[in-house]
């Protein structure tokens, strides 16, 4: 704590242009905490023998460079060259020219995962064409945490929160959790937010062997499905009942919003793996339905998971708020029309022209309160 305060004062007084440290686990633990306390953009270089392994505790969500120094201490013909390289690295960064910010455009946040890429790329391109810069964070846990921090620190002026799957990992034990505060900063800050359940059809784990046994047992009993993305990433599907609980969690967070907030729910799937019919343009080439897809018995083109999610949202969301809206969309997450819906709403919010109900223009988009959605679902059904 003393080091954090001391270095902060040095930085504020203009006494340092960068920071470098060298050590083992204890040295890395102390120095990385100091580095994490400094603003983004300040050069940070951490040399540690702990660099070969899980480095999340050291990096956190800051822009730190990590270098494996081979040895923990001592000077010899090898370490002299390594430390010289490190010294030139940090001095090079410290002497880098300051980037001009006079022509900077307002920054918009966006969350992406592989399964939501088409939606995100189209939406971000639209906003960039409208004069905004877009920062796209990878929704792998640290990405969500850093997005929340950037919003809290005032960098982000609005968020296109397409990919919220980190919430499922937090609630049900996946490895890509962003913690319990995901989806809270925009509400507290009062910035415009347009949200979707992108990627919430999957829980994420490492190798197949790392998937908890109770989930493997569910797969054997056809309670959920398993998708082996690659040798390092294995996913299991979120059940409709879990989606119902996730919806209530998200609704509770959105209820605290101090600014304009819209939740858009695509009923035909939440990502590339959640699709009824193969479509390369939407991210799934087949040959069969996506590995997390579950058809609603009464409306097979809709996802049962989406229907249960909507029920959870309707039970918990506060639609009496003038700046809160929930829209049901008869689209898949990665269809161009759905991306245009979300980015268009956010643009209207940023321009100050958004009004509740403005985007409800055709039979494919309607507010969650419309009872026709529930005519085929008994209370607590599905």
Kindly give the residue locations of the regions a language model identified.
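Metallocofactor- and cofactor-centric catalytic cores in central/energy metabolism, strongly enriched
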Residues: 1-97, 101-188, 193, 205, ...
């Amino acid at each position: 704590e003393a080091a954090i305060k001391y270095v902060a004062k040095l930085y504020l007084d203009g006494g340092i242009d960068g920071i470098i440290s060298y050590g083992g686990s204890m040295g890395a633990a102390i120095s990385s905490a100091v580095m994490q306390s400094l603003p983004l953009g300040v050069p940070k270089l951490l040399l540690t023998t702990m660099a070969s392994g899980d480095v999340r505790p050291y990096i956190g969500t800051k822009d730190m460079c990590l270098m494996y120094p081979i040895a923990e201490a001592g000077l010899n013909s090898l370490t002299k060259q390594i430390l010289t390289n490190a010294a030139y690295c940090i001095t090079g960064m410290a002497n880098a020219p300051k980037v001009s910010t006079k022509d900077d455009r307002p920054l918009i946040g966006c969350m992406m995962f592989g399964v939501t890429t088409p939606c995100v790329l189209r939406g971000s391109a639209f906003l960039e064409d409208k004069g905004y810069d877009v920062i796209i964070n990878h929704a792998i846990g640290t990405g969500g945490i850093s997005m929340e921090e950037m919003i809290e620190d005032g960098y982000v002026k609005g968020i296109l929160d397409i990919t919220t799957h980190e919430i499922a990992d937090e609630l049900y034990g996946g490895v890509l959790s962003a913690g319990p505060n995901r989806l809270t900063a925009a509400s507290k800050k009062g910035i415009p937010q347009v949200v979707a359940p992108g990627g919430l059809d999957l829980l994420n784990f490492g190798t197949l062997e790392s998937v908890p046994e109770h989930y493997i047992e569910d797969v054997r009993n056809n309670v959920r499905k398993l998708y082996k993305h690659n040798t390092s990433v294995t996913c299991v599907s979120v059940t409709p009942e879990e989606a119902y609980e996730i919806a209530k969690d998200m609704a509770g967070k959105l209820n605290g919003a101090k600014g304009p907030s819209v939740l858009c729910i695509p009923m035909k799937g939440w990502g590339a793996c959640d699709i009824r019919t193969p479509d390369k343009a939407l991210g799934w080439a087949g040959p069969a339905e996506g590995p997390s897809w579950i058809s609603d018995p009464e409306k097979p083109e809709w996802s049962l998971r989406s229907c249960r999610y909507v029920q959870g949202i309707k039970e918990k969301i506060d639609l009496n708020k003038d700046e809160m809206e929930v829209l049901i969309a008869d689209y898949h997450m990665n269809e161009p029309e759905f991306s245009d819906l979300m980015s268009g709403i956010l643009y209207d919010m940023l321009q100050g022209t958004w009004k509740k109900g403005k985007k409800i223009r055709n039979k494919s988009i309607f507010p969650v309160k419309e009872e026709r959605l529930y005519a085929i679902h008994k209370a607590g059904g599905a």
